[in-house]
């Protein structure tokens, strides 16, 4: 069966840039990788075809020869039996894209971990230290990360002599490729560790003490360097990122460095003025309510908000007044309110109800305009 054109295989034009070729390869390799298509021989064949096309078209010399001679340029010795390494999609697919596929593979850094931590508003504002328990991969304490049975060590690969690469004949060229025997590592484990089964790492839970700085807010994250998964074969560990989520508060609402709350005031105090206690994160403080205060009036208490973890000045506490209508009145109270209401006169009395006068004046004008 005739081979398909390499450009056609990757779905790119013959003038495609290396960046375009790499992008196409990444997409197709992810699509056809055997780990995603287990038992699908056709997908495996397409994966090999995509890999072969990528290796030719990202090598300047090979691409020039292919553009001039086509597949005939590589018929002597074929692809040298290099085949496709399906062991790790990230090592295989992304290794070539970022240059790792053409040199000896290095042990990979451990993966980063993420943990979502829920805090109360008080904890977020003041800072807190909490213990967390997370699943992770740690270096095996039996083989110390080598993957080899206790008392033994990995041996040098006899195929590549420890280089991790072999020279393969491909048409007019001799090129280096990752060793198919040791997968580019340069070493072979003959007797695997009984605990980690040759992986060098084991799954376990670990407990950490995490210090959350004062002033954090939802969306902030704290990085713990080196507390992620252990790296393979002695490589550095990844990091742990603790993502902060602040729970809603029954009194305060936070907006950046400011806090907001609603303060209920009875109608008598709102009319005559007075003093009430309002809560802050540091305790209760007195707030003076001037006479004739209306619902929605905002009072600012300087420095009673939050100091952001990023620095800057302390925020403020903004208290919004809500004038309450009295309920469950006894007969005496109702009588007094009737007398008070009668003393106000009609809705048009500007002196007692300026907003009501403005409203009813507007209503009267609206209907007057309709009847003109």
Swiss-Prot record:
A zinc finger (CR-type) spans 127-205. Zn(2+) 2 binds at residues 157, 160, 179, 182. One of its GO terms (molecular function) is ATP binding. Its main location: cytoplasm. Zn(2+) 1 binds at residues 140, 143, 193, 196. GO terms for cellular component: cytoplasm. It comes from the Bacteria. Residues 5-70 form the J domain. HAMAP family: DnaJ. The J domain is necessary and sufficient to stimulate DnaK ATPase activity. Zinc center 1 plays an important role in the autonomous, DnaK-independent chaperone activity of DnaJ. Zinc center 2 is essential for interaction with DnaK and for DnaJ activity. Homodimer. Belongs to the DnaJ family. Participates actively in the response to hyperosmotic and heat shock by preventing the aggregation of stress-denatured proteins and by disaggregating proteins, also in an autonomous, DnaK-independent fashion. Unfolded proteins bind initially to DnaJ; upon interaction with the DnaJ-bound protein, DnaK hydrolyzes its bound ATP, resulting in the formation of a stable complex. GrpE releases ADP from DnaK; ATP binding to DnaK triggers the release of the substrate protein, thus completing the reaction cycle. This is Chaperone protein DnaJ. It comes from Photorhabdus laumondii subsp. laumondii (strain DSM 15139 / CIP 105565 / TT01). The gene is dnaJ.
